[in-house]
């Protein structure tokens, strides 16, 4: 669960922008006024990881952060605990689950900087 606040609506693209300690998120338009606090549910399986700033993709939410912890969470699966936000600033902790193969190919390790990619359609409003 991520606590956010609505900061903007884009009526042309029917999107809402929300702010939180880890950055900004865009999602399908919410029919709530600017300034409204919104709790979002973000599933670990809905977060992809990049080790360099990604370019040329359709993902609307790309958030900088670092790997706080990582552990095996099932056969062939690794769960990463991520701290989203700029280094040295308060951030937001989320979890991402990726394959062990992906973690190995990316040479992921604790403390490394990452970019979390989150599809807008993966965000769900928690009332």
Which sequence ranges carry the predicted segments?
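Internal alpha/beta loop-helix hairpins
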Residues: 1-25, 44-45, 50
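Short, solvent-exposed loop/turn segments that connect beta-strands within catalytic domains
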Residues: 12-13, 87-91
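Short aromatic-glycine-enriched beta-strand elements
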Residues: 12-17, 73-82
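Short strand-coil-strand connectors
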Residues: 19-21, 83-87
């Amino acid at each position: 669960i991520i606590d956010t606040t609505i900061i903007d609506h884009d009526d042309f693209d029917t999107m809402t922008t929300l702010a939180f300690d880890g950055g900004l998120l865009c999602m399908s338009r919410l029919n709530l006024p600017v300034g409204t606090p919104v709790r979002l549910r973000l599933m670990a399986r809905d977060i992809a990881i990049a080790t360099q700033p990604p370019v040329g993709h359709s993902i609307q939410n790309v958030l900088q952060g670092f790997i706080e912890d990582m552990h095996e969470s099932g056969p062939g699966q690794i769960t990463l605990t991520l701290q989203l936000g700029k280094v040295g600033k308060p951030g937001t902790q989320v979890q991402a689950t990726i394959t062990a193969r992906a973690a190995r190919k990316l040479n992921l390790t604790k403390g490394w900087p990452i970019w979390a990619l989150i599809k807008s359609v993966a965000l769900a409003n928690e009332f």
